[in-house]
């Protein structure tokens, strides 16, 4: 399995997203890392992991960690808790930008990274 994304990369590290499917549906978090089509979001898809006894943890313990969630189960939040569908537009200088519609106006979310 390769780690290349198969879909769009509208979500990147630092974005605020909301889960639209799964056990964490409706919860909001910040993207910590992206790898392929899976994203780790702070506070979403939290699982418990049982750690065996070792020198670092003499009694053992249970830790809660965020597990990756598929990018199709997330939606970008803009201006707090409102979600928006991002579209790619080219401005006058030829730069590509993600935009969303608000009150029949196109609002720029951020620019798309230029290909190398």
UniProtKB/Swiss-Prot annotation:
The lineage of its organism: Bacteria, Pseudomonadati, Chlamydiota, Chlamydiia, Parachlamydiales. CDD domains: KOW_RPL26. NCBIfam families: rplX_bact (TIGR01079). One of two assembly initiator proteins, it binds directly to the 5'-end of the 23S rRNA, where it nucleates assembly of the 50S subunit. One of its GO terms (molecular function) is structural constituent of ribosome. One of its GO terms (cellular component) is ribosome. Keywords: Ribonucleoprotein, Ribosomal protein, RNA-binding, rRNA-binding. Belongs to the universal ribosomal protein uL24 family. Part of the 50S ribosomal subunit. InterPro entries: Rib_uL2_dom2, Ribosomal_uL24, Ribosomal_uL24_KOW, Translation_prot_SH3-like_sf. GO terms for biological process: translation. It comes from Protochlamydia amoebophila (strain UWE25). This is Large ribosomal subunit protein uL24.
């Amino acid at each position: 399995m390769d780690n290349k994304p198969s879909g769009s990369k509208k979500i990147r590290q630092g974005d605020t997203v909301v889960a639209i499917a799964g056990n964490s549906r409706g919860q909001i978090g910040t993207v910590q890392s992206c790898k392929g089509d899976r994203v780790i979001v702070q506070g979403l898809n939290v699982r418990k992991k049982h750690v065996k006894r070792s020198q670092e943890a003499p009694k053992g313990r249970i830790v809660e960690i965020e597990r990756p969630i598929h990018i199709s189960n997330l939606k970008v939040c803009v201006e707090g808790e409102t979600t928006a569908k991002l579209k790619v537009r080219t401005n006058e200088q030829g730069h590509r930008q993600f935009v969303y519609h608000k009150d029949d106006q196109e609002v720029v979310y951020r620019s798309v990274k230029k290909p190398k």
